[in-house]
Amino acid sequence: MQAYGNTRGGSGVVAYESGPDWIVLRFVDGATYRYDARHPGPWHVAEMQRLAAAGRGLSTYLNQHVRDDYAARLA
């Protein structure tokens, strides 16, 4: 996993890893979730990948659009 940039500070996301149609996020509490083409869907995954690479807006996007619609809790 690579560290999430968190350019504005205060994000709950600390790290991410992504592939062609998925992204895995680790949060400050250690919880790790996988999001994919099934949950929450390809459009959301693509946007989450874009925001993760940019290092800003990911936590806000999750709270506003994705919430608990993840594919799996990994840790």
Which stretches of residues belong to each language-model region?
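A charge-rich, low-complexity, intrinsically flexible signal that marks solvent-exposed coils, linkers
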Residues: 1-75
